[in-house]
Design a protein with these regions (language model features):
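Preference for well-ordered, secondary-structure-rich cores of eukaryotic proteins
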Residues: 48, 82, 107-108, 113, ...
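Active-site/binding-pocket entry motifs
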Residues: 36-38, 112-113, 123, 164
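Bacterial N-terminal signal peptides
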Residues: 6-14
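Surface-exposed cleft-lining segments at the edges of enzyme active sites
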Residues: 39-42, 126-134, 161-171
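His/acidic metal-ligating clusters that form di-metal
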Residues: 23, 139-161, 168-191
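N-terminal, active-site-proximal structural segment of metallo-dependent hydrolase catalytic domains
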Residues: 4, 16-82, 94-101, 119, ...
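Structured beta-strand-rich core segments of catalytic domains in phosphoester-bond hydrolases
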Residues: 65-159
Length: 191
C-alpha cells in the first residue's frame, strides 16, 4: 500500500499547474517498469527475447521519464543502445558500480536536462553500498534525479525505488526512508 502510494506520488503528482491551464506540449508521460532480471530460466521469456519489445514499448507510449527495476548491467546497456534518445543514471546495488541490479532512471534528452542525481540504500546507513538490512531478502536501493524541462524551464524531482518483496520490516522501514529522502532532497520541487 505505502509502496503504491510512493510510486504514484513519484509519477502522478501535479505537474506545476492545473491541467486545464497546461498547453498540450506541457504534458508529461512517466512510467515505472520492472523489466525482470536476465535469467535463462525464463525460457522463451528471457531478456534476449524481451529487450527489443521493452524498448519498442517505451517508444510506442512516447514516455518522457521512466524508472526501471531489476535491471542488470547488460540490460542497462541494451536499453541505452536501443534508446539512444534517452539519458540515464543507474548503478549496481551490490558495489555502487555495475554489480547487481540497477534501479535506473531514463529521460528524453531533447526534453530534459539532468541537474543532479544520487542513490541511497534501504538500510540503517543509506550510504552502505550493497547492505541487506532488516529482514530484507536482498539489498535494495533508490535512485533520484532532478531534471529541468527544456520546454517549460521548470524543475522536477523523480525517484525510482524497488522495495523488498519478502521482509515486512524492510518494506515498512524502506517506506519511511523514501519519505525522508523525498523531504530532504526534493525540497519544494514537484515529485
Amino acid at each position: 500500500m505505502i509502496r503504491n502510494l510512493v510510486l504514484c506520488a513519484a509519477v502522478v503528482s501535479a505537474w506545476f499547474s492545473p491541467a486545464s491551464a497546461r498547453p498540450s506540449n506541457d504534458e508529461l508521460k512517466v512510467m515505472s517498469f520492472n523489466i525482470r532480471i536476465d535469467t535463462k530460466a525464463d525460457g522463451p521469456n528471457q531478456w534476449s527475447n524481451r529487450r527489443d519489445f521493452a524498448a519498442n514499448m517505451i517508444r510506442f507510449y512516447d514516455i518522457d521519464i521512466f524508472g526501471a527495476q531489476e535491471v542488470f548491467a547488460n540490460q542497462m546497456t541494451d536499453l541505452q543502445e536501443r534508446l539512444p534518445e534517452y539519458g540515464s543514471i543507474g548503478i549496481g546495488l551490490e558495489d555502487g558500480k555495475s554489480k547487481g541490479q540497477h534501479d535506473p532512471i531514463f529521460w528524453k534528452k531533447e526534453r530534459f536536462e539532468l541537474l543532479d542525481h544520487g542513490f541511497f540504500w534501504f538500510a540503517e546507513d543509506i550510504n552502505a553500498i550493497g547492505q541487506r538490512a532488516w529482514d530484507a531478502a536482498s539489498p535494495r536501493m533508490g535512485s533520484w534525479a532532478i531534471l529541468k524541462d527544456k520546454i517549460s524551464k521548470r524543475k522536477l524531482f523523480f525517484m525510482n525505488v524497488h522495495i523488498d518483496h519478502i521482509g515486512q520490516v524492510a518494506r515498512r522501514e524502506s517506506a519511511k526512508l523514501i519519505l525522508d529522502r523525498l523531504g530532504a532532497l526534493a525540497g519544494d520541487l514537484p515529485v
